[in-house]
Design a protein with these regions (language model features):
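EAL-family c-di-GMP phosphodiesterase catalytic domain
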Residues: 42-43, 92-97, 118-131, 145-242
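A short beta-strand signature of PAS-family and PAS-like sensory folds
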Residues: 18-20, 89, 210
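C-di-GMP signaling machinery
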Residues: 1-14, 56-60, 95, 101-102, ...
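Conserved long alpha-helical elements within nucleotide-processing catalytic cores of c-di-GMP signaling
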Residues: 50-54, 63, 140
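Catalytic core of bacterial c-di-GMP phosphodiesterases, primarily the EAL and HD-GYP domains
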Residues: 25, 30-34, 59-134, 148, ...
Length: 242
């Protein structure tokens, strides 16, 4: 726990970004980037999130780490005021339950004079299902600030969440996207999700888009955005050029 606390305090993390592309020809969308994180180890090695995030979660330190990430991005945006982009950050379960987190976001944005629409907070379906009350409060508060909210790993079984909570984006589960060319049932699910989202004014993002053929099929279906190795691999945030 001490090691994790020290890493957060000292900022011993490297942020990465992965491009999320608008895939509809008529779209005039701003640039979107998913923010990913690695932890510095000795000898300049980087630990992937699967190695350290479970520990951060176990020690209930995710809200502190999420604050560090928000603050880092806000400072970067403050130094690059010409940038018109949306950065997508995954919000941990404990952060959803943290009543002080939305006011922390507001304070950071106001101090640095950064537009709230620069942030899209991503909530996992499982976390939303098991914490509906907390998710509802969190999404209402950050959307009131002007931030965006995305519901991740979405499948048709999660559609009842849309009756209770307002979202700006739905991220279609990558396991469906991977099979879109092989499995008619998964294709039908994606079509259903896309129609359901658009009917309620929500835009869709397909994750794990690996090939041009999958991308072409998603365009045909009418999905709005795509993310994955077929669009672009994760790159160090410090190298981001817009």
């Amino acid at each position: 726990a001490t090691r994790i606390a020290q890493a957060i305090k000292e900022g011993e993390f490297n942020l990465y970004y992965q491009k999320i592309n608008s895939i509809q020809p008529t779209a005039t969308a701003s640039s979107h980037y998913e923010i990913l994180i690695r932890m510095n180890e000795e000898e300049n090695n980087l630990m992937p999130p699967g190695s350290f995030l479970p520990l951060v979660d176990q020690y209930k330190m995710m809200p502190q780490l999420d604050r560090w990430i928000v603050n880092y991005i806000v400072q970067w945006l403050s130094a690059h005021p010409e940038v018109k982009a949306t950065f997508c950050l995954n919000v941990a379960r404990d952060t959803l339950n943290d009543r002080a987190f939305p006011s922390f976001i507001q304070e950071c944005l106001q101090k640095a004079n950064v537009p709230a629409s620069s942030f899209c907070f991503e909530v996992e379906v499982l976390d939303a299902r098991t914490n509906i009350a907390d998710t509802l409060i969190f999404t209402q508060e950050v959307r009131e600030l002007g931030c965006l909210v995305s519901l991740c790993s979405f499948d048709p079984d999660s559609s009842q969440l849309l009756d209770k909570i307002e979202f700006d984006y739905l991220k279609i589960d990558g396991s469906l996207v991977c099979n879109i060319l092989r499995d008619e049932e998964d294709l039908e699910k994606i079509i259903t999700i896309n129609q359901l989202a658009h009917k309620t004014g929500i835009q869709t993002i397909a994750e794990l888009v690996e090939t041009d053929d999958i991308l072409a099929k998603l365009q045909q279906v009418g999905v709005d955005y795509a993310q994955g190795f077929g669009i672009g691999k994760a790159q160090p945030f410090k190298d981001l050029e817009l």
